[in-house]
Amino acid sequence: MSAAVRLLGAALVAFSGWATGWWLTEKKRRRLAALEQLERLIALAQDEIVYRAAPLSEILALLKARRDMPGLCLEECGQLEEFSCPPDLDRPAWDQLEGFFTRLGSAAGQEEARHCAYYLKRCALLREGARQEYEQAKQLYTKAGLCCGVLAALMLF
C-alpha cells in the first residue's frame, strides 16, 4: 500500500513538473498572440488613417465591431489614445508600443502615416522575437519540466 501511494506521489510530482513547463510555454504563446493582434490593430488603424482619414472614435468603433482581437480587451477601452497594456503582454514590450496610442491623432496627414509605419515595424520586430521565444519554449519547457519533475520524484522516492 505504501509503495503505491509513494508511486502515485512520484507521478504527481512528475506531472506537476510537466504542467509547469506547459504553463510557461502557454504564457509565451499568449504573448505572441497578443503581439500579433496588436500588429493587426496598428495596421488597421494605419489603413483607416491613411486611406479614409477616419477620426479615432470611428476607428475604435470599427475595431470593437471586428471582435477578432479578444486578447486586447478593446471592449473596455473608451478612447484609442487611452488603450492600456493587454493582460498577456509583458511590460517591456508594452513600453515600446505604448507611444503609438499616446501620440495617436496628435499629427496630421503624412506625419501620422509615418507614425503608424514606425510602430508597425517595431511591433513586427517584437512579434518575430516572441515567435522565436515561443518556438524555443515549445521545444524545451515541457520536456525540461517533465525531466525536473521526474528528478524531483526520484529524489523524494
Model segments located where?
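Membrane-targeting and insertion segments and their boundary/processing signals
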Residues: 1-19, 30-34, 86-97, 137, ...
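Juxtamembrane/interface alpha-helical elements of multi-pass membrane proteins
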Residues: 2-76
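Glycine- and small-hydrophobic-enriched helix-loop-helix hairpins
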Residues: 45-48, 53-110, 114-117
